Regions:
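Conserved alpha-helical substructure of the radical SAM core
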Residues: 1-95, 102, 195, 203, ...
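Flexible mid-to-C-terminal extensions adjoining Fe-S/redox cofactors in radical SAM and related proteins
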Residues: 2-4, 243-252, 259, 263-336
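Cys/His-rich metal-chelating microdomains
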Residues: 15, 19, 23-26, 254, ...
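Residue-level marker for beta-strand->alpha-helix junctions and adjacent short loops that shape enzyme
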Residues: 15, 30, 60, 87, ...
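Short loop/turn motifs at secondary-structure junctions
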Residues: 19, 49-51, 99, 139, ...
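Residues that scaffold the ATP/ADP-binding catalytic core of kinase and kinase-like folds
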Residues: 19, 23, 63, 92, ...
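Radical SAM enzyme [4Fe-4S]-AdoMet core and its adjacent flexible, acidic
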Residues: 33, 99, 106-108, 113-252, ...
Length: 336
């Protein structure tokens, strides 16, 4: 029986108001998690020693009861982390600032044109307004950038922009074009978003120049990734081009965390779908130990899941290290 689970990510809705080229949630997402279902989770979260709940989606601020959900969880002493596109953050900044201990905003361009090309909306200025508004209410957001062919040349400019808008931190990950299950995908997914062979030396040069020019931002953790981790992103894109192997992945995320989809399905992580017998809305703790989930975790531990070999967001933690870093304002290693 699973005894501890410090971190839970809850997809409160499948709906999304972005139109990202990297994701299909906006095309077909309809389901909202009910407040009643989330209320039934609380005894399991308490027994599992859960300390941090991340609200995600879809776009969590589209849920008509997002504030009630956050208040319910917070009333049980849980620390809350909001993962958002930022489109409606300015509108809800006051309540979000009061309810969430940390906020991460996805931002994939440093100008209106790039943002619109990737996110499908002319909303760049609105997102920056939301970041500034949240910071003014006491929770300076982190910014997360999905690097891809349309924006990788802006790598240093992202850091400058994050500083300018008052972000707490900025992190980077590669666009995931290798996993057919990621980000609500239902159709074949194009790999045209990835860097091409001719882009690789340009990206490498940017990382090399940033090591010197942004040395303090690396040292302070304002840039969450080290130069070495940015080079792993380069290696990932190089592997997609057939030039070398994918970077080795060390991850035990299913051992200290779980993801609950809006329909109640429990997943071992963001990128691997959960088994049919793992339903959090029935008994979350039992779902974690269902036959299907136990078999899936065993496959992951044994390295038999192809998705793990090309993962763009792996994590390795001990339970004690997760507990120590659960105060999110001091947890850059959790990529918030």
């Amino acid at each position: 029986m699973r005894s501890r689970l410090p971190l839970v990510t809850l997809y409160v809705t499948e709906r999304c108001n972005s139109r990202c080229v990297t994701c299909d949630h906006w095309r077909h997402g309809r389901t909202d998690a009910s407040l009643a279902s989330i209320t039934r989770l609380l005894p399991s979260l308490e027994r599992l020693g859960t300390r941090m709940v991340a609200l995600s989606g879809g776009e969590p601020l589209l849920h008509p009861e997002w504030a009630q959900i956050a208040q319910l969880l917070k009333s049980r002493g849980l620390e809350l982390w909001l993962l958002t596109s930022g489109l409606s953050l300015a509108k809800h900044a006051h309540r979000a600032g009061a309810l969430f201990d940390a906020i991460t905003v996805s931002l994939d361009g440093t100008n209106r044109e790039t943002y619109a090309a990737i996110r499908g909306l002319d909303a760049f200025d609105k997102v920056l307004e939301g970041i500034r508004a949240a910071a003014s209410f006491g929770v300076a957001p982190s910014i997360r950038v999905t690097l891809q062919r349309a924006n990788y040349r802006q790598l240093p400019m992202f850091v400058d922009l994050a500083r300018a808008v008052g972000a707490r931190q900025i992190s980077f990950l590669a666009v995931d074009v290798a996993n057919p299950h990621a980000f609500g995908r239902v159709d074949d997914f194009s790999s045209d978003l990835a860097l091409r062979v001719e882009d690789l030396p340009v990206f490498e040069g940017l990382v090399r120049s940033m090591e010197g020019e942004y040395a303090e931002s690396f040292r302070s953790g304002f840039i969450a990734e080290s130069p070495l981790k940015l080079r792993r992103i380069l290696q990932y894109f190089s592997a997609l081009c057939g030039r070398e192997a994918f970077p080795p992945v060390r991850c035990n995320a299913p051992e200290f965390s779980a993801v609950i989809a809006a329909n109640g399905r429990v997943q071992p992580c963001f990128f691997i779908p959960g088994p049919l017998d793992a339903d959090a809305w029935g008994d979350f703790r039992a779902a974690l130990d269902s036959d299907g989930m136990a078999a899936l975790r065993a496959e992951i531990r044994a390295g038999r899941r192809a998705e793990c070999g090309t993962c763009v967001c792996s994590m390795w933690r001990t339970l004690d290290s997760v507990d120590r870093s659960v105060t999110m304002s001091r947890a850059p290693g959790l990529r918030i």
